[in-house]
């Protein structure tokens, strides 16, 4: 299943190398194939259960840009900042953009920020994808260049703090 990373999270492109499988050519080259596996989550799935199993999935290699999200809001006007329901976005939603459909000068290729979970989910759905689950996100974020789970490595911790 394809999974798209939105920048209300963080970019993982440099942290995926231990989890990333060879690209099978069936999905966009903008996505990394993350191998499935098992790990201990900081949020156990059930009382007394420590290990979580993750099936393989795909994750965008780079954050969603303002230009990409602007294209989405032009195609899905209900997600424009001047039309979105307040239930789905707060008053900071895309507040730094020049207009309801244009990011403004110099920020088109920067990561989009100040989007809600609902808007991020709708963006993914429009692309035929979904947001990663908590466990998928945690699993991918725990990887370093040399370890599938580097959370106990002080050097890795310094790179993410």
Model-identified regions with their sequence ranges:
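Active-site microenvironments of metalloenzymes and redox enzymes
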Residues: 56-155
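Mature N-terminal segment immediately following signal peptide/propeptide cleavage
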Residues: 30-38
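Positively charged n-region of N-terminal signal peptides that target proteins for export
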Residues: 1-4
